[in-house]
């Protein structure tokens, strides 16, 4: 793939969305982490500069964040 830098953060499952966003953007400055509530509609496009951080209604990371 053409995406550069760290690509996934499985260790962040169970963290708060805000903490996960900070870690992701620190570990790969090329990406912007976007917090999204599980079940929200999102676009299907793939982007190397985006990491979706899927959180529960309580703001806890529910899936391993990854570039996409």
Curated annotation (Swiss-Prot):
N-acetylserine found at: 1
Keyword terms of this UniProt record: Acetylation, Disulfide bond, Protease inhibitor, Serine protease inhibitor
Pfam families for the chain: potato_inhibit
Keyword Acetylation: yes
Gene3D superfamilies (UniProt xref): Trypsin Inhibitor V, subunit A
Sites marked Reactive bond: 44-45
Disulphide bonds in the chain: 3-48
Keyword Transmembrane helix: no
InterPro entries in UniProt: Prot_inh_pot1, Prot_inh_pot1_sf
SUPFAM superfamilies, alphabetized: CI-2 family of serine protease inhibitors (SSF54654)
Coiled coil: none
Lineage: superkingdom: Eukaryota
Gene Ontology MF terms in the entry: serine-type endopeptidase inhibitor activity
Function statement: Competitively inhibits Glu S.griseus protease by forming probably a 1:1 complex. BGIA has no inhibitory activity against 2 other acidic amino acid-specific endopeptidases (S.aureus protease V8 and B.subtilis proteinase), chymotrypsin, trypsin, pancreatic elastase, and papain, although subtilisin Carlsberg was strongly inhibited.
Family, as annotated: Belongs to the protease inhibitor I13 (potato type I serine protease inhibitor) family.
Protein name, UniProt field: Glu S.griseus protease inhibitor
């Amino acid at each position: 793939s053409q995406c550069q830098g760290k690509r996934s953060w499985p260790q962040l499952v169970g963290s708060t969305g805000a903490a996960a966003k900070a870690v992701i953007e620190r570990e790969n400055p090329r990406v912007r982490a976007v917090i999204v509530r599980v079940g929200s509609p999102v676009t299907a496009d793939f982007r190397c500069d985006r990491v979706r951080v899927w959180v529960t209604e309580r703001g806890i990371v529910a899936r391993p964040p990854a570039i996409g």
